[in-house]
């Protein structure tokens, strides 16, 4: 099965090019006119990782009412213009039938896009159909993806770009086991308003350090088996938080990816982070007592170990000092400050030569 991709299935007449109001056919070069801002918008959508597929009904194409040659001249000119400006359509799907033919490929039927659906090519959460007619929205519904109705005044191409490229980086994770019941909500583009309840006061304070210094909003509630000890609560919180952070980051396009910090307070806390998609932890800190507040010091390493597993990051973290409270706090603060650098959006590029993180 092919890797699922973000695909925009885009109508032609009335969406990419102006549809003639009288005969609804672009059958001469002088009738070819692009919709406003379509080229810069398609370029931005490509930069954001979308693949472009044209899907169009062309009534009676190849018949006497719409000769193939009449269609080809303006269509090929349109494609040449797009290509010359860097816009690449990965596929052009055309239904040539009349509605009365009752074919299987005319939108909103699925015949034209059948290969994409059956081949596992479509990322259903991120893909969309863009078109000016209700049939385009019906196609989207039949494909189980989002539909966006284009209109040059109310939902033009600049609006569509903004809509598709500025999605909130928010994720919610619910994790339930026999030992814990955890709900996590992270918003990477909001700060403040953190609400953290794990049943462990010192641990709550440490998690708040990550969110505050990481520059994101965290809402977290944990009901755990603290009547036994803090192990499951700390471990499962880390797993759920790491998963939520990873989901909120999405495809990681535009992020800094890397981060590092150095001294904090009287402790020498060092942190280097790579949101690489590969979990690895190098941890160096020692403690002189078994607990700080209600948190077992042995669980500090275990927290970051579990977090790196679900966040899928490479993390080098160390701290030295004389006070265990300050050592632990410096570790969480340093991680938060480093995470802030790594998740900050700096553009649209994917920070990887592999093309995936």
From Swiss-Prot:
Obligatory cofactor(s): Mg(2+); Zn(2+)
Subcellular location: Cytoplasm
Region of interest: Imidazoleglycerol-phosphate dehydratase: 169-357
Residue stretches in coiled coil: none
Source domain of life: Bacteria
Keyword Lyase: yes
Catalytic activity, reaction form: D-erythro-1-(imidazol-4-yl)glycerol 3-phosphate = 3-(imidazol-4-yl)-2-oxopropyl phosphate + H2O; L-histidinol phosphate + H2O = L-histidinol + phosphate
CDD domains: HAD_HisB-N (cd07503), IGPD (cd07914)
Binding site for Zn(2+): 95, 97, 103, 105
Pathway(s) where this gene product acts: Amino-acid biosynthesis; L-histidine biosynthesis; L-histidine from 5-phospho-alpha-D-ribose 1-diphosphate: step 6/9; Amino-acid biosynthesis; L-histidine biosynthesis; L-histidine from 5-phospho-alpha-D-ribose 1-diphosphate: step 8/9
EC number: 3.1.3.15, 4.2.1.19
GO cellular component, one term: cytoplasm
Segments for region (Histidinol-phosphatase): 1-168
Record key words, sorted: Amino-acid biosynthesis, Cytoplasm, Histidine biosynthesis, Hydrolase, Lyase, Magnesium, Metal-binding, Multifunctional enzyme, Zinc
Primary site of residence: cytoplasm
A single BP term in Gene Ontology: L-histidine biosynthetic process
Active-site residues per Swiss-Prot or TrEMBL entry: 11, 13
Annotated residues for binding of Mg(2+): 11, 13, 132
Molecular-function annotations in GO: histidinol-phosphatase activity; imidazoleglycerol-phosphate dehydratase activity; metal ion binding
HAMAP family in alphabetical order: Bifunc_HisB, HisB
Family affiliation: In the N-terminal section; belongs to the histidinol-phosphatase family.
Protein name: Histidine biosynthesis bifunctional protein HisB
Organism name: Vibrio cholerae serotype O1 (strain ATCC 39315 / El Tor Inaba N16961)
């Amino acid at each position: 099965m092919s890797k699922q991709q973000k695909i925009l299935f885009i109508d032609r007449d009335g969406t990419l090019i102006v549809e003639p109001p009288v005969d609804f056919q672009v059958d001469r070069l002088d009738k070819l006119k692009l919709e406003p801002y379509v080229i810069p918008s398609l370029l931005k959508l490509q930069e954001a990782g979308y693949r472009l597929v044209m899907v169009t009904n062309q009534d009676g194409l190849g018949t006497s009412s719409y000769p193939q040659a009449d269609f080809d001249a303006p269509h090929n000119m349109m494609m040449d213009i797009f290509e010359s400006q860097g816009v690449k359509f990965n596929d052009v799907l055309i239904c040539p039938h009349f509605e009365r033919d009752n074919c299987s490929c005319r939108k909103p039927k699925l015949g034209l896009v059948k290969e994409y659906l059956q081949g596992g090519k479509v990322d259903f959460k991120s893909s969309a159909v863009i078109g000016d007619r209700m049939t385009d929205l019906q196609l989207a519904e039949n494909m189980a993806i989002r539909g966006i109705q284009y209109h040059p005044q109310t939902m033009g191409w600049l609006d569509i770009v903004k809509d598709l490229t500025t999605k909130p980086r928010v994720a919610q994770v619910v994790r339930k086991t026999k030992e814990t019941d955890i709900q996590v909500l992270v918003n990477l583009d909001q700060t403040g308003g953190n609400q953290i309840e794990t049943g462990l006061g010192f641990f709550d304070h440490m998690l708040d350090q990550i969110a505050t210094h990481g520059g994101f909003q965290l809402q977290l509630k944990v009901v755990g088996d603290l009547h036994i000890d803090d192990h499951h609560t700390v471990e499962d919180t880390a797993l759920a938080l790491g998963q939520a952070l990873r989901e909120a980051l999405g495809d990681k396009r535009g992020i800094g990816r890397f981060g590092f910090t150095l001294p904090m307070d009287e402790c020498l806390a060092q942190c280097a982070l790579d949101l690489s998609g590969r979990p690895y932890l190098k941890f160096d800190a020692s403690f002189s007592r078994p607990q700080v507040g209600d948190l077992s010091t042995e669980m500090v390493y275990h927290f970051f170990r579990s977090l790196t597993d679900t966040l899928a990051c490479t993390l080098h973290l160390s701290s030295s000092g004389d006070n265990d409270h300050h050592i632990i706090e410096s570790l969480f603060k340093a991680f938060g400050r480093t995470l802030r650098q790594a998740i900050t959006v700096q553009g649209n590029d994917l920070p990887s030569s592999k093309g995936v993180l």
